Amino acid sequence: MNIAKPNSYRSGPDERGHFGIFGGRFVAETLMPLILDLEKAYTAAKADPAFQAEMNGYLKNYVGRPSPLYFAERLTEHLGGAKIYLKREELNHTGSHKVNNVLGQIMLARRMGKKRIIAETGAGQHGVATATLCARFGLECVVYMGAVDVERQQPNVIRMEMLGAKVVPVQSGTRTLKDAMNEALRDWVTNVHNTFYCIGTVAGPHPYPTLVRDFQSIIGNETKAQMQEVEGRLPDSLVACIGGGSNAMGLFHPFLDDPSVEIFGVEAAGHGLTQLHAASIAGGRPGVLHGNRTYLLMDADGQIQDAHSISAGLDYPGIGPEHSWLHEIGRVNYLSATDDEALAAFQLLSKLEGIIPALEPAHAIAKVMELAPKRAKDHLMVVNLSGRGDKDVPQVGDILRGKSK
């Protein structure tokens, strides 16, 4: 599809929350006043220096930002091409990028006088970050999690409960992230007066994709400054994994108007693109889910199909609407990595750098293993290491033991 190139790739969405034909707000009438309230509160907070100052204080002293930009010397040497830097989001409090967004949303919820917070979670990282901030600010916390994910992410379930959250296993549908999001939306419709829905990715009805992106953009803004400091210039390429796509959008957005920077998003190809996978752009088409129009995995009748990934955090049949738009206008290249490729990358990074990545960013590392060797030695490549692998060690251990039998 030929779409006219915009003057800026960073000016979206429009006032109705659209990025081209994507995005928007497709919600029940009951939720419309809440969504409009949220948008109003967010616009006011953005313009309020006190809100920004308070948030920056927590980002520094509670989350532990800025996160380091680390030169992966042995990985670079091993692959024999581009100079690889890791943006170390896994060193944040709670172990992933999720806390950047949750902090912003919980501060908004407090500003709006909401005392009960609900969230959906796949890998459990967004749930843990939400439970953590609710504990810090003394708010009630309910986390919806697909029953399948509850099984495969036990360490995070225990963490959430220790932090005082109520974890609700969702038994409907495929019992994964999509179903958890459905349940959270149902809860929100029922409890509109006192409840704030803290969405974990750049999806959902407007203004969520925008506010989550803005809270996550600290990743790309820091990377820009850090790269300038160590290399004196912009990176040549960026790589990040994509489920809904908030860690990727956080890294990408500040660089969208820098034409010299090549950008790669990596979806989960599961068992392969002709079999079960979670690659909405590679294997999907535009449709409406969870309040926005975006690329989705659908059958011929438009029914949402099951997504599959070894990684619970990428196991979603859609993608953030801004990613769909960036794909259609050609600013970002969307690739995919299979379960097996991610497993190999998980092991490689652990052994070469002493960093055990989450299975989600292991998908990004898998594509770096392909991209880096084809690039010159002075090519600067930044990978978003969006989460740590503690939560995945039991699962990966079982898989590897099974394979060695």
UniProtKB/Swiss-Prot annotation:
PROSITE patterns: TRP_SYNTHASE_BETA. It catalyses: (1S,2R)-1-C-(indol-3-yl)glycerol 3-phosphate + L-serine = D-glyceraldehyde 3-phosphate + L-tryptophan + H2O. Its cofactor is pyridoxal 5'-phosphate. InterPro entries: Trp_synth_b_CS (IPR006653), Trp_synth_beta (IPR006654), Trp_synth_beta/beta-like (IPR023026), TrpB-like_PALP (IPR001926), TrpB-like_PALP_sf (IPR036052). Its EC number is 4.2.1.20. Transmembrane segments: none annotated. GO terms for biological process: L-tryptophan biosynthetic process. The modification N6-(pyridoxal phosphate)lysine is found at K98. Keywords: Amino-acid biosynthesis, Aromatic amino acid biosynthesis, Lyase, Pyridoxal phosphate, Tryptophan biosynthesis. Gene3D superfamilies: 3.40.50.1100. The keyword Repeat does not apply. Tetramer of two alpha and two beta chains. The beta subunit is responsible for the synthesis of L-tryptophan from indole and L-serine. This is Tryptophan synthase beta chain. It comes from Bradyrhizobium diazoefficiens (strain JCM 10833 / BCRC 13528 / IAM 13628 / NBRC 14792 / USDA 110). The gene is trpB.
